[in-house]
Design a protein with these regions (language model features):
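Short phosphate-binding loop-to-helix
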Residues: 52-97, 105-107, 111
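N-terminal nucleotide-binding beta1-loop-alpha1 segment
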Residues: 1-15
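Conserved SAM-binding loop
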Residues: 21, 47, 98
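Conserved core of the sugar-phosphate nucleotidyltransferase
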Residues: 101-193
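Short internal beta-strands
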Residues: 45-49, 128-129
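Short glycine-enriched, charge-decorated loop/helix-capping segments at active-site entrances
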Residues: 17-23, 70-72
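A short, N-terminal amphipathic alpha-helix
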Residues: 27-45
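Catalytic donor-sugar/metal-binding loop of nucleotide-sugar-dependent glycosyltransferases
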Residues: 177-197, 202-217
Length: 217
């Protein structure tokens, strides 16, 4: 298996969020790198960034560095273009795991890989998700996953829904090439019950710091 880590340093909401200190002297990248090295060889890890300073971080762990075109950064990037640019240079025909560093609390990679090995013949991809139990309304206040009045259902009886965590995706190489997306057409849902905080804003960063520190004892 090859691992791809997309690592932007140009976040407009949190400056250098992926490489600034998060816990003690470790950045979000450092934390994820150490988690990955618990189950994968460093030569199988490929890090894509628009900033050449990240190469020094990759050298520290023995990871492969891929310099990214700045045009493939930001929130307006066409996802298939990004997926293709980051996965085409990765050698081999084995599976690809796409791992984000912005979810430091997620560390169930070993269990996910074991489950993937068991279901790989029946699915083209794996996506890490968390069960969602809540009552949803659209922007016109119409119920989405339940009904008002007599037909109301308590949360325990709502139809199963899942939140994509953006922490881990695993895809067969042919699925990556064909669909050029994080998820194939027949994904396996890897369900985690662990607390997960995806860091998009400064408040998320600070909250994740508190929780991560608590979990470290």
């Amino acid at each position: 298996m090859k691992i791809v880590i997309p690592l932007q340093t140009c976040s407009s909401r949190i400056k250098h969020k992926n490489i600034r200190p998060f816990y003690e002297d470790d950045s979000l990248f450092d934390i994820k790198a150490k988690q990955i090295l618990a189950f994968e060889k460093p030569e199988n890890v490929y890090v894509s960034s628009e900033n050449s300073i990240v190469k020094d971080l990759c050298d520290k762990y023995g990871f492969n560095f891929m310099l990214r075109d700045p045009a493939l950064c930001g929130n307006e990037v066409y996802q298939p273009d990004l997926i293709k640019a980051l996965t085409d240079p990765v050698p081999g025909d084995d599976d690809i795991a796409w791992i984000q560093v912005t979810s430091p609390l997620f560390n169930e990679f070993i269990r996910a890989i074991k489950e993937w090995e068991q279901v790989r013949n029946q699915h083209d991809s794996l996506v890490a998700v968390k069960r969602f139990k809540g009552h949803l309304l659209d922007d016109k206040a119409n119920p989405v996953n339940y009904a008002f009045g007599y037909w109301h259902k308590v949360s325990q009886k709502l139809p199963p829904l899942y939140t994509v965590l953006w922490s881990l995706f695993i895809l067969k190489r042919e699925a990556v090439k064909k669909f050029q997306y994080h998820i194939g057409v027949n994904p396996y849902l890897f369900v985690t019950e662990s607390m997960v905080i995806d860091i998009d804003y400064e408040e998320d960063f600070e909250l994740a710091q508190i929780v991560y520190k608590k979990l470290q004892g």
